[in-house]
């Protein structure tokens, strides 16, 4: 069954005409990303050549996807909007709350028991408001979306930063916070800064141990975690043909680690085949009828530098297997360099655990190719040194892989098969270790490797690679093992090599599944009652944030001056805290607990200016709030890098933090702060960061004249009585300033 088929038929009936109108209006050829963007303007009469990276534009996405950890807050906000049903097709996916422990057979029932209150809430809200519901065990949101919902030329938003995964099938798919999702769910315009365009020219063909994952790992080394901010990466070139749709999805998925708005590949024969193999023949045919406009125009491909803001050249034939890390996904290292780099940087060289899965690499093809390496270990008599853990991407993939013997290949080398869920990738991992603070190394096929993320241990050195390389390094038990050149010993002491990975792109017998775990939206469920217990510690109805009082912010104590990387994991930790994602008061206790205090180098230990004691960040914030005092956070570059979790914006707002002053922001987090009525400001001169002292009282003036492109003034009142003043800037437009004045975007929408 093709889901939402009437919406898809209507879309394709007008898509090519919309693109033609766009070309006629802007009077030039278009890139593929531009075609999709222009075809989704909220008001087509406003079509014009927008300034990339500068102007905000209103769009009308086709659909919304939400995962269970972020859906709670998004749907709590939606329930306050007074709507009878969602305005566009939407889905909820229960994948983040399932803890990986001993294996799927026991872990899934335990998760259903532990999270029953949340699952019941999400299921009832989905039924009441006409939202598709994918229950626990159904699969990871982005793999399920690719298999069932993604379509060439479409636009979607998702309350998860790896939503761009659907770009592998030709969508502009953007990760957003819950408040942005509510805009789309209620039929309002969805605002986005017109992205810059980075063209990635692929030539050659991957071979040997090189995989699509290595393509994006190499690009991360080139562009870094900030290089894609406010940009779409559009892939083109002859190299496209050799990469499968799921491989392209992997590349788009980790574009999120570049800070990119999204990434996109054009429609091609591989995409058509993927649609047909996943039971969507009609969509493949509709896309084929529009194929000329599901790619960049010929003139663009002939002279790409005239149409893209930046060009990145990648020769696939020269791509090597990579290991990126530790602690940041842009620390790119070809595996051939690890023998020198590892000891030079004092990396722990023994690989204790290898983890294959996540929304980035859990397709049938990923598992089939990884299994071809596992199979060699037992066929060639090689002792496996590390522990291997597998998370299939969906129930359809798990069922098919089990039927085809793929899971048996993993089990024969001692692998644990976990639930079709995120698990360790989002910190939902009960790691069995005698000391979860010791220095050690793990290798994953995941997307992020921030300190503490997988297992809570700050001394776990996590490296990211392909599923194939992950299995090879787990077998070898060494971080510096290069499967293309190095040998291993079999049980007789003979030197043997691992052959390059092989595996089918699609299952030869086709995909199969008994129960996908899906409950379709139905008009019959409109009278379903949604119950939230007032005594719940996991769910809490939202109260509106207070509007701006019309005054400047004066004498704010510094809550924390963070040093170095401060991701959304540092601001609102996941793992054991995921259970509170529907309860703002409770989850606010983790505010900035992972951030490093610039004045003492410690995490979650800041000075409470009211009594001079050093306490947890949330404790200090609550003390200020109890006295009616607003506070401020000061940070360095790319503040809020990482996931789309709006809790990282709602928590400081709830605890009366009014300002985040940073050297720069990650795109999604900056938007989330604006949506919640906070002030996200940047230093005009980054060196002014160094002027901020631990005991400062900080004032922000000029708010009565707050306007687009205006400057505000920060005054630091130091403990010794001296002062420093400097200007700060912002990216707020008129609408976003209205959100601030109303107290939040939701407050503003409610007044309209």
Each model region followed by its residue ranges:
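Extended C-terminal subregions enriched in glycine
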Residues: 379-429, 435, 643, 649, ...
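Acidic, glycine-rich flexible loop/linker segments
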Residues: 488-505, 670-739, 746-749
């Amino acid at each position: 069954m093709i889901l939402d088929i009437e919406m898809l038929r209507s879309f394709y009936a007008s898509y090519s005409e919309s693109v033609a109108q766009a070309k006629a209006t802007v009077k030039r050829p278009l890139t593929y990303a531009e075609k999709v963007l222009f075809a989704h303007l909220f008001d087509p009469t406003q079509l014009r050549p927008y300034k990339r990276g500068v102007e905000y534009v209103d769009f009308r996405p086709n659909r919304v996807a939400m995962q269970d950890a972020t859906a709670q807050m998004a749907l709590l906000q939606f329930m306050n909007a007074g709507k009878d049903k969602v305005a566009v097709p939407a889905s909820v996916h229960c994948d983040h709350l399932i803890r990986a422990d001993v294996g799927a057979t026991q872990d899934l029932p335990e998760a259903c028991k532990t999270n029953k209150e949340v699952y019941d809430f999400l299921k009832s809200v989905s039924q009441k408001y006409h939202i598709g519901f994918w229950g626990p065990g159904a699969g990871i949101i982005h793999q399920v979306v690719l298999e069932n919902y993604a379509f060439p030329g479409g636009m979607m938003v998702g309350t998860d930063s790896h939503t761009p995964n659907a770009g592998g099938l030709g969508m502009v798919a953007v990760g957003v916070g819950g408040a942005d999702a509510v805009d789309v769910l209620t039929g309002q315009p969805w605002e986005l800064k017109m992205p810059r365009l980075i063209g990635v020219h692929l030539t050659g063909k991957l071979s040997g141990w090189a995989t699509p994952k290595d393509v994006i790992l190499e690009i991360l080394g080139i562009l870094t975690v900030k290089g894609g901010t406010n940009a779409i990466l559009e892939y083109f070139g002859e190299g496209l043909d050799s990469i499968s749709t799921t491989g392209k999805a992997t590349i788009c998925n980790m574009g999120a680690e570049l800070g990119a708005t999204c990434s996109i590949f054009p429609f091609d024969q591989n995409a058509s085949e993927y649609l047909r193999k996943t039971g969507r023949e009609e969509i493949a045919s509709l896309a084929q009828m529009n194929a000329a406009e599901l790619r960049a125009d010929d003139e663009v491909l002939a002279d790409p530098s005239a149409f893209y803001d930046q060009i990145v050249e990648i020769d696939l034939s020269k791509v090597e297997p990579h290991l990126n890390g530790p602690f940041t996904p842009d620390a790119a290292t070809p595996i051939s360099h690890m023998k020198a780099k590892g000891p030079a940087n004092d990396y722990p060289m023994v690989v204790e655990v290898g983890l294959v899965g996540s929304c980035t690499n859990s397709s049938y093809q990923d598992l089939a190719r990884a299994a071809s390496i596992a199979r060699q270990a037992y066929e060639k008599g090689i002792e496996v040194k590390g522990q291997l853990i597998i998370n299939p991407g969906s129930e359809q993939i798990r069922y098919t892989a089990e039927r085809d013997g793929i899971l048996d290949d993993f089990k024969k080398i001692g692998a644990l098969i976990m639930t079709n869920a995120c698990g360790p990738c989002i910190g939902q991992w009960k790691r069995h270790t005698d000391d979860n603070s010791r220095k050690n190394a793990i290798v994953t096929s995941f997307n992020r490797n921030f300190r503490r993320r997988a297992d809570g241990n700050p001394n776990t050195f996590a490296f990211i690679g392909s599923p194939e390389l992950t299995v090879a390094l787990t077998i070898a038990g060494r971080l510096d093992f290069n499967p293309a050149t190095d040998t291993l010993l079999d049980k007789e002491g003979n030197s043997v090599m691992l052959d390059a990975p092989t595996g089918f792109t699609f299952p030869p017998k086709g995909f199969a599944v008994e129960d996908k775990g899906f409950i379709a939206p139905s008009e019959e469920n409109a009278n379903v009652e949604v119950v939230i217990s007032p005594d719940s510690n996991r769910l809490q109805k939202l109260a509106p944030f207070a509007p701006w009082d019309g005054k400047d912010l004066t004498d704010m104590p510094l809550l924390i001056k963070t040093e170095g990387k401060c991701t959304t994991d540092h601001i609102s930790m996941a793992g054991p805290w995921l259970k509170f994602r529907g309860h703002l008061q409770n989850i606010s206790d983790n505010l900035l607990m992972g951030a490093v205090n610039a004045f003492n180098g410690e995490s979650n230990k800041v000075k409470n200016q009211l009594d001079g004691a050093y306490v947890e960040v949330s404790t200090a914030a609550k003390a200020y709030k109890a006295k009616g005092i607003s506070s401020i956070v000061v940070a360095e570059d790319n503040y809020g890098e990482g996931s789309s979790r709006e809790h990282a914006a709602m928590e400081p707002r709830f605890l009366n933090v009014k300002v985040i002053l940073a050297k720069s922001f990650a795109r999604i987090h900056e938007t989330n702060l604006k949506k919640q009525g906070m002030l996200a400001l940047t230093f005009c001169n980054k060196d002014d960061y160094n002027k901020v002292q631990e005991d400062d009282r900080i004032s922000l003036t000029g708010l009565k004249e707050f306007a687009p492109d205006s400057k505000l003034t920060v005054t630091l009142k130091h403990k010794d009585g001296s002062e420093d003043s400097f200007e700060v800037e912002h990216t707020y437009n008129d609408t976003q300033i209205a959100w601030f004045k109303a107290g939040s975007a939701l407050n503003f929408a409610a007044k309209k």
